[in-house]
């Protein structure tokens, strides 16, 4: 498995680039970060935009590196009044298969927001979701700087 290790500086630069893209065409009301991987990018985006309306959802799909459940399990949800009629920026670290993003986006859309757009630091060609905003496009397994330990130490 090919691995791409991203350093803090590269991720921060990517988030700034993504924010420049977002500023051009999307004036969102609420940021929703997907736990765990999307939380750091979501917090960073909230500071860059000075948008304190940051919510989180938890969805679990991967059990371990390359090991998935049958489908994503959404274990922490939102209240309808938090997103009703609002423009949502859904943030995650990576659109890998895209299955988690689809499940979370469909859940949010069921709460009647005005619009939901997706921002991810990295996207893979196999993803069934084409994010509205992304910077890195790769088919490699990505290790972000906030992740516990490199793949080699997990075996």
Each language-model region and where it sits:
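PRPP-associated nucleotide enzymes
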Residues: 1-155
């Amino acid at each position: 498995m090919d691995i791409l290790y991203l350093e803090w500086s590269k991720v921060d630069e990517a988030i700034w680039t993504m924010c420049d893209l977002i500023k051009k065409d999307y004036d969102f009301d609420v940021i929703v970060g997907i736990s765990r991987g999307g939380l750091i990018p979501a917090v960073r985006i909230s500071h860059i935009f000075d948008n304190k309306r940051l919510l989180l959802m938890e969805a679990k799909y991967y059990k371990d590196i390359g090991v998935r459940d049958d489908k994503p399990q959404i274990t922490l949800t939102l209240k309808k009044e938090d997103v009703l009629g609002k423009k949502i920026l859904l943030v995650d670290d990576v659109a890998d298969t895209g299955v988690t993003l689809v499940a979370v986006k469909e859940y949010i859309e069921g709460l009647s927001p005005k619009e939901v757009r997706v921002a991810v630091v990295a996207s893979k060609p196999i993803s069934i979701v084409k994010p509205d905003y992304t910077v890195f496009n790769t088919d490699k397994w990505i290790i972000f700087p906030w992740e516990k330990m490199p793949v080699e130490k997990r075996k």
